[in-house]
Structure formats: structure tokens, C-alpha cells
């Protein structure tokens, strides 16, 4: 299965008639493995800061999580495993696997919990596969 299939079928999937706004699978080095057409153009330093927060939990809290120039307020996640951010009625969930970061961006009417389930389910599966 291609990485694009994971994004299209497992991240941008239909949940009660709704779906994520954007999604991507990005390597720890910042390379894009696959992304939805709507995923924001990001800067390498934005991904580097996210990776740093996985290694040093809490490092993003003072500045916020930035992706594609959008700032998200960091909310409770799972240190070293999941980072969650909020902006208005939407937000972002980032799950770290052995080799990649799984990104999900959502907006109302999708809920934070639904985004977490979508992103973390794929991330957990990839971890089980050694990825």
C-alpha cells in the first residue's frame, strides 16, 4: 500500500459524514511521504520544532505549534507520543511513529476526539508494523 493510500483512505476517511481538513505522513527528517491536497505548505523549522517537542516534551508550549504559518495553542497530549493543538473551532493532532509523523488537521463540525482517533489509530497501526 502506498503512503498516499494511507492518507486518502485512513486519514481523510469519512466519519459520520465529516472528514479531516488536511492530513499528511511526514518523515522525521521533514520529507513528505504523502499528503492531502489541502495540507499546508510548511517550513522545515516548523517540523524540526515538532520533532524537538517529542524529544523534549513541553518545548512547544511557550511558543505554540506552528505549521504552514498557522499557530496552534498546544494542549494536553501524550509526552513523546502525541502532540495536540487548538486554534479556534479547529486544531491539529500529531502522532509520532518510529519513522514518521502522522498529521491530522480538523475544523468544526469534526471534534478533537474524532481527529485524535483517526490520527492515533493509524499511528498505532504503523508502530505495530515497525514503522
Swiss-Prot record:
CDD domains: PROF
An example Gene Ontology CC term for this record: cytoskeleton
Disulfide bonds listed in the record: 13-115
Source superkingdom: Eukaryota
Main location: cytoplasm
Presence of keyword S-adenosyl-L-methionine: no
GO molecular function annotations of the record: actin monomer binding
Cellular compartment(s): Cytoplasm, Cytoskeleton
Modification after translation: Phosphorylated by MAP kinases.
Any one Pfam family match given in the protein's UniProt record, by short name: Profilin
Keyword entries, A-Z: Actin-binding, Allergen, Cytoplasm, Cytoskeleton, Disulfide bond, Phosphoprotein
Segments carrying motif Involved in PIP2 interaction: 81-97
Record flagged with keyword Phosphoprotein: yes
Any further remark recorded for this protein: The variability of the residues taking part of IgE-binding epitopes might be responsible of the difference in cross-reactivity among olive pollen cultivars, and between distantly related pollen species, leading to a variable range of allergy reactions among atopic patients.
Protein purpose: Binds to actin and affects the structure of the cytoskeleton. At high concentrations, profilin prevents the polymerization of actin, whereas it enhances it at low concentrations.
Subunit record text: Occurs in many kinds of cells as a complex with monomeric actin in a 1:1 ratio.
Cited PANTHER family: PROFILIN, PROFILIN-3
Family: Belongs to the profilin family.
Protein's name in the database: Profilin-4
Protein species of origin: Olea europaea (Common olive)
Origin organism lineage: Eukaryota, Viridiplantae, Streptophyta, Embryophyta, Tracheophyta
Amino acid at each position: 500500500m502506498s503512503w498516499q493510500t494511507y492518507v486518502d483512505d485512513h486519514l481523510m476517511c469519512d466519519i459520520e459524514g465529516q472528514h479531516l481538513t488536511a492530513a499528511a505522513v511526514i518523515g522525521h527528517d521533514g520529507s513528505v511521504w504523502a499528503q492531502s491536497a489541502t495540507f499546508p505548505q510548511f517550513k522545515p523549522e516548523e517540523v524540526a520544532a515538532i520533532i524537538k517537542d517529542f524529544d523534549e516534551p513541553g518545548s512547544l508550549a511557550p511558543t505554540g505549534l506552528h505549521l504552514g504559518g498557522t499557530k496552534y495553542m498546544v494542549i494536553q497530549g501524550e509526552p513523546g507520543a502525541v502532540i495536540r493543538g487548538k486554534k479556534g473551532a479547529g486544531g491539529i493532532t500529531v502522532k509520532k511513529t518510529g519513522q514518521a509523523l502522522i498529521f491530522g488537521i480538523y475544523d468544526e463540525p469534526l471534534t478533537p476526539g474524532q481527529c485524535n482517533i483517526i490520527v492515533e489509530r493509524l499511528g498505532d497501526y504503523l508502530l505495530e508494523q515497525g514503522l
